[in-house]
Amino acid sequence: MKRRDFNRLVLGAGVSPVLAKSSLAQMSAEELQTTPSKAVAPSIIIKNSPRTYNQVNVPRKYTAGRRRFTIYWTWSYPWEANRDVTELDNRFSTMTEVRRVGWPRYEKPEWSEREFLQGIAGTLELFHLSTVRFQNIVGEATGHPVVVYQRIDQAGQRLPLDDQVLGDTDTMMIFGLDHMITEQEASPAEIEAVRKFLTREGTCLMIGPHHDVGVSSDPAERQMEYAHHGDPLVPRQQRFGLYTRSLMKGLGVPVENRWGLRPARSPETNQIAPLTAMRDLDKRGWLTDVTTFNFHPHLPHYAVTTDDTKLVRVLARQPVDMTHPHPFTEAGNREFNTFLWMPPSGTRAGDILLADLTIFTTLFGGTDSLDRFWNNLATRT
């Protein structure tokens, strides 16, 4: 037995630390080493819950007043997992890189090569684990399990959005975590299927493209962006969300994900600064009793590309960290758009929301405010 394996074994098994600490979709160095305050104990523990994989989904029946949530990861799992790790940009970290940055958090038996994937695929699996708390809370609130799909899964099975996927769904959550270099784009048939979905009364489309870092070809500007967010696991260029951009273009959603901005912290608590919420515009009450989302060091600014204030409503903005310069703040900005709403219009009976996917991926490290936001989405229409 290798000494490394022996050391891991003697640490003891117990409950995996991923059940007790924050583990967000883009695993940042800071998140690996800290746990949000007021963490809420989970009511369902992963190790005690049956987990399915590679199964045909049984459609959920409609229940009045109880929403059926679906998560759709826009990536090609094989293409992301098989990226050349000698490439510096536009790829996910390997699990080995995560372990190095987060040491010694992942030096436990459950993270060894005997039990967990060590390459990029291991990091992708962290993302899947990171939605379990959200699934539990929403499932308890609605009485329906949250279904999780991938555009192209581990087995290479392609699942475009169509009437079958959307048919048993009331709230469709599009998690835009595909690197643009992998060329995932919504087809005309998918766009039409989503448009048809939104003609159904009571539907909601949540679009969550992640950050777009390093757009400029100027190395100095890329370095400024990197120094601003300060996460060693994020390369100097990491551009996400071609699929969501193509979907939004097809649906006429005048919004674009830009930058990767570090939220400001409250000097009193060192936690993420409170949202600037436009509560008078929040007609559905999604932000009722919600003061903050969760801290993530590189969040997108959702730039509105139309002057029509009735078409898109900015419901919340996040103060940005001013301690390190960034092109966004140098242009005079102090807050970035973080939660947007397109109310029903014309033949579209459903709502369209925009919020970064990491808001839904805190694994057993959420706060009361975040739990209330999730519950509001599940129960308010």
Range-by-range predicted roles:
Residues 27-381:
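Short, surface-exposed patches at the edges or C-terminal ends of soluble domains, predominantly
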Residues 5-24:
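N-terminal export signals
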